[in-house]
Amino acid sequence: MKNLLRSFLLLIFGTITMAEDVDLFEASNRVVFEFNQALDENFFEPIARTYKESIPKTMQNRVSDFSSNLNDIYTLGNEILQFKLFDSVSTFGRILVNSTIGLVGLFDVASDIGLEKTNEDFGQTMAVWGVSSGPYVVLPVLGPSTMRDSTGTYVDITENIDVTKELNTTEEVALLLAQAVDTRVKLLPVTVLLKNSDDVYIATRSSYLQKRQFDIFDGNPPIENDDF
């Protein structure tokens, strides 16, 4: 299977990205960060605020639930790769329920009946496999990441393309934009907190790395820092 082969090749690549300095590329990262900040302040954030204030909450919920159902597909694959069998069965149940009773994912019926949502991506999968995070990096447009997570993001994006390949170009673009806006709306409260920081770059980096620790260890990160 070409996707599995691609994933393992990326895993091999990811193992060479280890570095003791968490922000080895800080100088260049700050340049990209400033670019991303300007792009966000002048484009993404205004769109997100307009969307939140203008679109009925019911409609926003449909977009959010539909995106969440698609995300469950990626989560299921990563849970299997991480040997989280109980979680994978639960996530499969979520997909089944929401894709049928929930009208192709427009309604999150699964959560209402007690099927808890989990989130797993390929970056987390590589962490579970023992791949070091490598240094912190800031990706153009995509934002905070690490060498491991940027590799994981590539896999996640290509898998997203595979899942939506039956859509035409217009439908794919519309779906991508809807998911991007939905994600940005959810980050609006965080934006306010970060902007009040003495150094927004450092605050963003710290917030991202802490959240990734939280995600990788399923909400129970170790007290002492380690290679993750």
Where are these regions (language model features)?
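A structured, mid-to-C-terminal "fold-capping" secondary-structure block
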Residues: 20-23, 124, 129-228
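Mid-length scaffold segments of soluble, non-membrane domains
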Residues: 69, 76, 82-144
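Short alpha-helical hairpin
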Residues: 20-21, 37-48, 71
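Membrane interface segments of multi-pass transport proteins and intramembrane proteases
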Residues: 42-59, 161
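Sec-dependent signal peptide recognition
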Residues: 2-10
